[in-house]
């Protein structure tokens, strides 16, 4: 009886040691982080893993969402600019986008621009044209452009490594459309955002400017 009890104790100690060893095992960190690469097949990889993978990059992660009230797990910026396009082809129509400067609603805004039948949005059309391999894209809101501006210093070199257009610093080459209309002037103006300085500028919607989809 005593011998059987001793064997039982030894067995229990061995099991506890095995559990303890398992608890300290190192696992690879697969969490999505800023500067990770979004590939055309939907995979998100670190830059080091992307280089080995042979996959095609389409965007670079620049922000991870921590808030439950914000849609999606995070944001990735498209590698290339959209050539200058007008927000709308005519003045006088509110296109149904938000005028809230704090809302992370670029996806909803872009769909509203695209779906407005009383006026045509060359900008929204050009963004919808770049959808491929199931990867959606949209024009960021003012709030989302602020997040991109805050991450520019770390994200832009990775964009360039992937063969994309680096986020600009030049004063005269840094203005991009947002999908946010100007409050009280929704029928005529929307906001431009400077990725050079973080400044904003209300602008007639019929003017052609670049966009950087996310």
Range-by-range predicted roles:
Residues 3, 56-59, 171-178:
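Short small/polar-residue motifs
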Residues 1-19:
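Sec-dependent bacterial lipoprotein signal peptides
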Residues 21-133, 205-214:
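Short, compositionally biased
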């Amino acid at each position: 009886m005593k011998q059987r009890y001793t064997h039982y104790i030894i067995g229990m100690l061995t099991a506890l040691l095995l559990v303890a060893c398992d608890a300290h095992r190192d696992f690879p960190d697969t969490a999505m982080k800023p500067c990770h690469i979004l590939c055309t097949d939907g995979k998100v990889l670190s830059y080091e893993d992307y280089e080995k993978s042979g996959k095609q990059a389409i965007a670079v992660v620049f922000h991870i969402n921590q808030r439950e009230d914000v849609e999606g797990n995070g944001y990735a910026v498209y590698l290339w600019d959209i050539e200058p396009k007008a927000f709308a082809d005519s003045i006088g129509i509110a296109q149904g986008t938000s005028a809230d400067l704090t809302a992370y609603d670029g996806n909803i805004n872009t769909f509203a621009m695209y779906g407005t039948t009383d006026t045509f949005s060359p900008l929204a059309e050009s963004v919808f044209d770049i959808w491929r391999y199931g990867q959606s894209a949209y024009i960021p809101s003012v709030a989302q452009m602020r997040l991109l501006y805050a991450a520019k210093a770390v994200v832009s070199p990775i964009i360039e490594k992937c063969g994309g257009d680096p986020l600009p610093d030049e004063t005269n080459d840094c203005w991009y459309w947002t999908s946010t209309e100007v409050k009280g002037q929704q029928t005529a103006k929307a906001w431009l955002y400077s990725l050079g300085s973080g400044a904003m500028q209300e602008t007639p919607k019929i003017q052609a400017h670049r966009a950087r989809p996310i």
